Amino acid sequence: MEDVLATAEGVVLVKLVKVAQKLGLKGENGTWKEFLDFYDKQLGSSSLSDPSKRRKDDLVAFLTTLKKKEDLQLLAKSLKLDNDVFEKFKKKSLDETAEQRLVRMTLTHDEYPLDYLFPSNAEDWVRTGLGKKKMEPTKIEMIAIDCEMVLCEDGSEAVVRVAAVDRDLKVILDEFVKPNQPVVDYRTFITGLTAQDLEKATISVVDIQEKLLMFISEDTILVGQSLNHDLKVLKVDHARVIDTSLVFKYNYDGTRRPLRLKRPSLNYLCKCILGYEVQKEGVPHNCVHDAEAAMKLVLAILDNGAETSVPLSKEMLEAEKSKLYLHRIPCNVPYEELNGVVSRDIPHEVKPSKKQDRHYYSAIVVFKSPEEANQAFENIAGDFGKDSRGLSQKQIFLEPSSSEPRLYVLVRKMVEDDLVGEVIAEENNASSKKRKRENHSKGTRDRRRCKPLSRRKQRSNVKRRR
């Protein structure tokens, strides 16, 4: 959000502050007027509350104090509503195609506005469909994209490999990209790439943008799993997208209250929908395979009528209970240093997320059983609370440093303890209902076979025997 605000025009910032005023949004220093009382006192200036009469820096300073996810989503939605191209593809029409329905499902998802809020006004960004001539009909209608990223010295992520496949699963792009910053972490355990792999890379992000634009027009549909991360590192803002992490969702039927699990992973979707794992345990990612998998998931819906809800089984929940989620990890803290943060006594494995932002990243801590994960969480001495999803969470301070402020990470449960019981109870209930239906159906058939003949049919049978 900060990058977007820094490049936004003044009139846009004024509108956002007015939206925040109207909704009564509060940042770290309160509402807009409360913020001004604090802010102007520090600067020693007079307080003008009309946003249109304030400097751009003042507006940005207030908006960056808004930290609640739901508040940021509201602001992101306000920004997106100004995008005519976005509005065009968001609306439902009578002649809507199956492909466009998936685009609309993505664009109307609650998480979309914030995920796809890009600083596309910046000079090095490309916005498709704006002032560009539409390409000839040789264009590919759907393209799946996936990228591999590394961590740079300044804390930013840089794309180092890009893959794109078309609707026929033909690879139309597979390029190594030269990072424009010194790399501090190649994330070989995820990307499979090393410094040697990139020694001969000469292509820049600008070159990749030009190559992509050879295939993309305003009407092209870009496909991907958590595609916003890939578009962000490519610095491409494209309105017509299908994000499989937003299209597919867990089936929560039968539970007493909504479950707040993370979005289904690409691997889990492939297992449920396609019947295979795209990412094997201990094997680095391959962006070509990941792009193909995302396209196959979309084709499974379009060509085979696959459902967009995936089952929530007790086995899956048990596996989730064997994990803890580490987040808000500062990018300057290597993941290897996290091994003893959650527990020094209980064996576990730390698996960093493939996707990271400029300042923080997240990781999954995997234990051998739900009991060990729960014990590790109970042993943490940090402050207990709930995250925005209502899940149990604690704060862990890292080892103090003499030269830096004390850093901390947050650790939370993946699911609450009673949810597995709910799902098991619902599965047992469903099995019981199924048995009752089968028994009822069997009993009905038996009664029909044993039903006495009427007197007329009995006399008829006697006559035949005579």
Curated annotation (Swiss-Prot):
CDD domains tied to this protein: REX1_like
Compartments where found: Nucleus
GO molecular function (one): nucleic acid binding
GO cellular component, one term: nucleus
Superkingdom of source: Eukaryota
Disordered, as annotated region: 426-466
Family the UniProt entry places it in: Belongs to the REXO1/REXO3 family.
Keyword Hydrolase found: yes
UniProt KW keywords: Exonuclease, Hydrolase, Nuclease, Nucleus
SMART domains given in the database record: EXOIII (SM00479)
Annotated ranges, domain Exonuclease: 142-298
Record's compositionally biased regions (Basic residues): 445-466
Observed effect of gene inactivation: No visible phenotype; due to the redundancy with other SDN ribonucleases. Simultaneous knockdown of SDN1, SDN2 and SDN3 results in elevated miRNA levels and pleiotropic developmental defects.
Role played: 3'-5' exonuclease degrading single-stranded small RNAs.
Organism, as annotated: Arabidopsis thaliana
Protein name: Small RNA degrading nuclease 2
Keyword Zinc-finger annotated: no
Chief localisation class: nucleus
Known EC number: 3.1.-.-
